[in-house]
Amino acid sequence: MIKARNLTKNFDGFMALDGVSFEFDDGEIFGIIGHNGAGKTTLLKIISGLIAPTSGELFINDIDVVKNPVALKENLGYLPEESRLYETMTAENYLAFFGEIYGLSPKEIRIRSNQLFAALSLEPDGKKLGEFSKGMKRKTAIARSLIHEPSFLVYDEATSGLDPMSSRFIADYLRTLKKEGKTIVLSAHNLYQVEAICDKVMILKRGKMVAFGTMKELREQFGTLTYAIFFSIKDAGALIGHSRTYRQEEGLFVCDAESMAELNECTGLIGEAGGKVEKIDSRYPSLEEMLVKIGK
C-alpha cells in the first residue's frame, strides 16, 4: 500500500507541489500526468526518496519514506527521464557494475542479466552502449532498474522520444511486470498508453492534484458522453442552411452531438433533409481530451 498525505515541495519560494494526497495498492500501475511544469518529476523523486518533501507524509509498505528514504532503496527500481549511460561500457559490464552495487554475486549477475536481455529482446553482443539506438539504450536502462529484482518501480517518461514500435514494446513489458507482482508508478506524455495500462491516474496542475482515480472514475467526473450520428443522404445540398455542422467519415456523413437533446435535434434535421441514420456511436472523451479540458 502506498499512502501520501499533504505532500508539498517548495523550491526557494516556488511551490512545485502543493498538498498532494493519494493512495493506491501494491501490484497496480499508477500514472501521473500533467502539462510541463505540473510537478510530475518532483513527485516521482519524492516517491523514490531522492528528494525530501518540504512537508507531508509518504508511506510505502509501512516504510516512512520521508524519515527513512534509505530503507526503500534495495527494493526500488528507478528510471529517470534522461538515463545517463556509461557509453564506453558494454551492456553486460553496465549491468554487472550495478549488480555489484546491489551486492549480487557474479553468478547472480550473469543469470539475471541474461534473463533481462531475453525479456527485453536485447542482443548486446559486447557492443558499447554508445553504439546502441535510443530504444536499445532505454531498454538497457530499464534492465539496470530491474537487475536487483525490486518490487517497486518508479519510471519517469519510460517511452519518451522512442519510435512507436519501441514505445509499444516497453508499454507491453510494463504490463508483464505488473503480472509478476510489481508495483509501478510512472509519468508519461503518451496519454493513450497511460489510459491503456494504468489502474489509476493522477492529474497534476501547477503542483496541485486536480483529479485522481480509475479511468472510469475520471470519465464520470470530467467526461461527457458524446454521440456521432452516421447517416446517408442522396442530396447533400439539403443540409445547407441547417444549424448543425457535418463531416464525412467511412463514406457517410457524420453529425456530432454532446447531449441527448443535441442527438434528438440532429436526427430530426437528418430526417427533414431526407437522410437515413445508419448508426450512432457513443463515447467518453479520451484522457488527452480530459487533460486539455482540466488544463484550461
Question: Model segments located where?
Answer:
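Walker A (P-loop) phosphate-binding loop of ABC-type ATPase nucleotide-binding domains
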Residues: 35-39
